[in-house]
Amino acid sequence: MTKIAFTGGGTVGHVSVNLSLIPIAQERGYEAFYVGSKNGIEREMIESQLPGIQYFPISSGKLRRYISVENIKDVFKVLKGVLDARKVLKKQKPDLLFSKGGFVSVPVVIAARSLNIPVVIHESDITPGLANKISLKFAKKIYTTFEDTLKYLPKEKADFVGATVRDDLKEGNRTNGFQLTGFNDDKKVLLVMGGSLGSKKINELIRQNLDTLLKEYQIIHLTGRGLLDETIQREGYKQFEFVTDELTDLLAITDTVVSRAGANAIYEFLTLNIPMLLIPLGLDQSRGDQIDNAKNFQNKGYAETLPEDQANTTNFIESLHKIESNRSDIEKQMHEYHQLFTKEDLLDKILKDTNQKETRES
C-alpha cells in the first residue's frame, strides 16, 4: 500500500493543497501523514480539519533574504529540523513526499532526499519562493499553478498543473452565511480579508471608509488574529478575526472581495466567480510574489489591482467603483476559466511521477 508524507506550512496557502489531496489519498486506502512545525498554522489546520492524520512536529527556522543575527540561530534550527524529519521518515517509511513549500518544508525535503524518498514540490506563485528554490535541488518534479512560472524553472523538472481548490468550496450555504452575519439580500456583500495573518493597512482602509462603504455594501471583515476592533459596532458590518469551516458559507453570500493576492486564495475567488480588488503585499514586506499574482489576474480580466503604497481613500473607493461598473465583463471572463487538473488527476500525476504502481489507471 502506498504511503505518502505531506509537508508545507507557515501560511494557509502552504497547507491548502495538502488539505485537498489528503482526503483523496485516504479514500483510495493510501496511508498519509504530515510533517510540520511545532507551532505553525499548518499544525492547527491539519489537526482541526483532518484529525485522523498523524502530525509529526519538527524544529524549523525561518528563511530570510536579508542579513540578520537570527539567520545564524535559524541555521541550527534547520539542521535540527533535518535530523528531526529524518528520524520521522526513517520510522514511517513513506513511498514519496509531497511538499507545498514554506520554510518548514526545506528540512523535510532534504531529509527525504537523504533517504532516497522521491520528492514532488508545488509552487503556487508566479515566481518560485526561496524554500522551493532550495528544495528544487532535491526534488524529482515541481508543479506550478501559473503557466508563467515555467520560465523560471528547469524544463525537465517543471510541469504546469493549474490551481487545486478544496472540495467544499462550492458547498457554502447562503442561509447559513446570512445567519452568521445578520445580513440580507437587500444590499451587496463585500468580503474583506488580509491573508492568514491579517493586514493592518487593509483594516485601516476599511475602518476609515466605513461610512462610505456601508452606503453600498454589507461588510464581512476578516481582520486577522488579535486585530478586532470591538469599539466598532455598526449595522451591516461584521468582524471576525479568522474563520475556517464558516468561510464557505460567507463566500456563498459574497459579491465582491478585497484581499491580498496569495495564489490559493485568489484562485478560490476565481473558481466561485467573485470579482476581486487585490491589494498585494508590497516589496517592503515580501519578495513581490503577490504583486506578480495580482498583475496576472488583472491582465486576464479577473480583478482590479491596487498597490499598497497607492492604497489611499480615493484610489480605494475608485477601484471598487470600477469593479461595479465592469462587473458583467469580469464575471464573463471568470466563467471562461476551467480547472486544468482535478485533485484526483493531481494525485495520479504525483504517483506516476514518483513511479508508484497504485494509480487510478493501473
Curated annotation (Swiss-Prot):
Q: Could you give a single Gene Ontology term from the biological process aspect?
A: cell division
Instruction: Give the organism the record lists.
Output: Staphylococcus carnosus (strain TM300)
Query: Can you tell me which family this protein belongs to?
Result: Belongs to the glycosyltransferase 28 family. MurG subfamily.
SUPFAM superfamilies given in the database record? UDP-Glycosyltransferase/glycogen phosphorylase
Q: Tell me, what does this protein do in biology?
A: Cell wall formation. Catalyzes the transfer of a GlcNAc subunit on undecaprenyl-pyrophosphoryl-MurNAc-pentapeptide (lipid intermediate I) to form undecaprenyl-pyrophosphoryl-MurNAc-(pentapeptide)GlcNAc (lipid intermediate II).
**Under which EC number(s) is this enzyme classified?**
2.4.1.227
Q: Can you say what this protein is called?
A: UDP-N-acetylglucosamine--N-acetylmuramyl-(pentapeptide) pyrophosphoryl-undecaprenol N-acetylglucosamine transferase
- Membrane topology per the record? Peripheral membrane protein
The record's Pfam families line, in alphabetical order, gives:
Glyco_tran_28_C, Glyco_transf_28
- Name the encoding gene, please: murG
GO CC, any one term: plasma membrane
Q: Which UniProt keywords apply?
A: Cell cycle, Cell division, Cell membrane, Cell shape, Cell wall biogenesis/degradation, Glycosyltransferase, Membrane, Peptidoglycan synthesis, Transferase
User: Any idea which GO molecular function terms this record carries?
Assistant: undecaprenyldiphospho-muramoylpentapeptide beta-N-acetylglucosaminyltransferase activity
Q: Does the keyword Cell cycle apply?
A: yes
Localization recorded for this chain is: Cell membrane
What is the reaction catalyzed? Mur2Ac(oyl-L-Ala-gamma-D-Glu-L-Lys-D-Ala-D-Ala)-di-trans,octa-cis-undecaprenyl diphosphate + UDP-N-acetyl-alpha-D-glucosamine = beta-D-GlcNAc-(1->4)-Mur2Ac(oyl-L-Ala-gamma-D-Glu-L-Lys-D-Ala-D-Ala)-di-trans,octa-cis-undecaprenyl diphosphate + UDP + H(+)
